[in-house]
Amino acid sequence: METARRDSIDFFLGATTPAGFKGYFEPLRHEPGMQMYLIKSGPGCGKSTLMKRLARAAEQRGELTQRIHCASDPDSLDGVILPGQHRAIVDATAPHVVEPDAPGADEVVVSLYHTIDAEKLHQCTDEVKALFARNALLRSRAARYIACLLYTSPS
């Protein structure tokens, strides 16, 4: 995880629990006057890179910046909040899917799907599907391990 600056706050808004992944973006969405930008795209399409650049630019302007780190990859960002502007930009894809309640009014969907090289991915369809299935299996396994740690008392 990058070193925090004085003008930034770093935290998580989600975690793997015994019941699977739990995200806590709802309170942020319902903060009065908050404008949400919901980024939609596949893995590796630049969502976190975009948010890191936005956070860095805001910090260079002297703005307080809140970075929401990814629970499964703390070097990645799931969101950036700019409290002074009442704006937030979040990764709105699985496992923390966020859909707009008031598109255009409170939330703006930012699609980065055009950055996907669909032709190249299509050539590897079986491998891509296998990797997504493996990811789901490992997330489920992690949830079971956490449940064992929490609910199994030492003998």
Region roles according to the model:
Residues 28-33:
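Phosphate-binding P-loop
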Residues 50:
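Hydrophobic positions on the alpha1 helix immediately C-terminal to the Walker A/P-loop
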Residues 151-155:
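Conserved small/polar residues in nucleotide/adenosyl-binding loops
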Residues 46:
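Conserved glycine(s) of the Walker
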Residues 61-114:
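Conserved nucleotide-sensing/catalytic segment adjacent to the nucleotide-binding pocket
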Residues 43:
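The conserved Walker
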Residues 2-24:
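N-terminal pre-Walker A segment at the start of P-loop NTPase domains
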Residues 39:
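Hydrophobic anchor at the beta1->P-loop junction of P-loop NTPases
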